[in-house]
Amino acid sequence: MQDRGDKPERRSRKGRRPRRRICFFCVDKIETVDYKEVGKLRKYITERGKILPRRVSGCCAKHQRQLTNAIKRARHVALLPFTVNE
C-alpha cells in the first residue's frame, strides 16, 4: 500500500480569489465577432499562434465560440497566420 505522506501537502491560498474578468465583447455590447477585425482578434492569440482559452481571455462562452470561429475564418482567408515563423 502506498503511504499518503509521499506527496507534499498543497497549501490553500489565503485571501480572496482573483476577480473574474469581464467579457470585452459584452461590455462594448458587440453582438457578433467579425473575422475582418484583425486587430481585436490578435489580442486573443498567443505569440505561437494559438487561440487563448476562455479562462485566460475572460470572454463569456457565447463570445468565445464566436471568437474561435472568427479566428479560424481569418486564418483561412490569410488575414491571420496559422503559426509564427521562427
Swiss-Prot record:
Gene3D superfamilies linked to this entry: Ribosomal protein S18 (4.10.640.10)
UniProt keyword annotations, A-Z: Ribonucleoprotein, Ribosomal protein, RNA-binding, rRNA-binding
GO biological process, one term: translation
A GO CC annotation given for this chain: cytosolic small ribosomal subunit
Origin: domain of life: Bacteria
InterPro entries: Ribosomal_bS18, Ribosomal_bS18_CS, Ribosomal_bS18_sf
Family: Belongs to the bacterial ribosomal protein bS18 family.
Subunit: Part of the 30S ribosomal subunit. Forms a tight heterodimer with protein bS6.
PANTHER family given in the database record: 30S RIBOSOMAL PROTEIN S18, SMALL RIBOSOMAL SUBUNIT PROTEIN BS18M
Function: Binds as a heterodimer with protein bS6 to the central domain of the 16S rRNA, where it helps stabilize the platform of the 30S subunit.
NCBIfam families to which the protein is assigned, alphabetical: S18
Protein's recorded name: Small ribosomal subunit protein bS18
Protein species of origin: Heliobacterium modesticaldum (strain ATCC 51547 / Ice1)
